[in-house]
Design a protein with these regions (language model features):
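Metallo-beta-lactamase
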Residues: 80-143, 246-251
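Alpha-helix termini
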Residues: 42-43, 70-81, 103-109, 174-176, ...
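Short, well-ordered amphipathic alpha-helices
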Residues: 35-39, 64-72, 97-102, 200-210
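Active-site metal-binding motif and surrounding structural segment of the metallo-beta-lactamase
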Residues: 31-86, 177-182
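Structural motif
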Residues: 26, 50, 153-157, 181, ...
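Cap/insert and terminal regions of metallo-dependent hydrolase folds
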Residues: 162-253
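Active-site flanking residues adjacent to catalytic metal/cofactor-binding acidic residues
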Residues: 28, 54, 157-159, 184, ...
Length: 257
């Protein structure tokens, strides 16, 4: 209750909804809070036809909104844009979507195309190249993080994972990947990491990437997937991680690389 009271008083960047990311017109994960996020950040979801999922946890896989997009209630969008909704994810993501769709007689499956993705097998969406990597998270499925490239810059999108598995680090080193931006999970805050990272694991990952020459002195480091487990509100945690040279993300943050 103390955290909630502080947030209600201070508002601003302290108000944190559940994470998802828009890169150009590709959405990574679909938050249960997507409606308010789009209103607050002035995002037009009718322009988004590609969804890429990291895993099937409900704070990332919002099946209800997917169904809305595939139903007649989205007829205005369909008249405006006849493109099929392209969805990328693992088997568990596909199963989660199909389970909900099976209960909705109004869904038009011709409006959706699912692409099964696997670790270390790159795929392209327009000018963006995605390379899925193995995450340490939701251990009953192949949870993923991503290397994302646009031909000019390279992002490590490592949100919702604990310390990266050795096979993921080995792949990064063997492929000689250089990151311009690194975005890391920081759900655990000052606590020890588990299937999420905290600040200790954030520092350790940065050092591993440095030793592998996968980053440069100009690489920017963002901490994302912040939660109440951090033990402090965002502006307090922001000061702490800032001492380590990290930037804490917030709702509506826009990064240009």
């Amino acid at each position: 209750m103390l955290f909630r009271s502080k947030v209600r008083t201070l508002l601003g960047k302290n108000v944190k909804t559940r994470s998802c990311t828009l890169i150009d017109q590709v959405m990574i994960d679909l938050s249960p809070d997507i409606f308010s996020q789009c209103i607050n950040s002035h995002v037009d979801l009718s322009e988004v036809n590609h969804l890429v999922f990291t895993h099937s946890h409900s704070d990332h896989l919002n099946t209800t909104e997917i169904c809305f997009r595939l139903r007649e209630m989205a007829s205005v969008i369909q008249k405006k844009d006849k493109k099929v909704m392209e969805i990328y994810g693992n088997d568990a993501v596909q199963d989660g979507i199909m389970e909900i769709i099976a209960k909705d007689p109004h869904v038009d499956l011709t409006r959706m195309r699912f692409h099964r993705i696997q670790k270390f097998e790159p795929f392209r969406i327009g000018h963006l190249k995605f390379t899925p990597l193995k995450a340490y998270h939701k251990l009953d499925e192949e949870a993923l993080i991503f290397v994302i490239e646009d031909g000019r810059s390279t992002l490590l999108y490592a949100n919702d994972t604990g310390a990266l598995p050795e096979e993921t680090l080995d792949f990064i080193e063997q492929q000689n990947i250089k990151f311009d931006v690194v975005s890391m999970d920081t759900s655990r805050g000052i606590l020890d990491g588990d299937t999420h990272m905290g600040i200790r694991e954030n520092v350790e990952l940065r050092e591993k990437l440095r030793r592998m020459h996968a980053v440069t002195p100009d690489t920017e480091y963002y901490l994302n997937h912040y939660s109440h487990m951090c033990g402090m509100i965002p502006q307090e945690y922001e000061r702490l991680v800032g001492q380590e040279g990290f930037l804490l993300t917030y709702d509506g943050l826009s990064v240009t690389v």
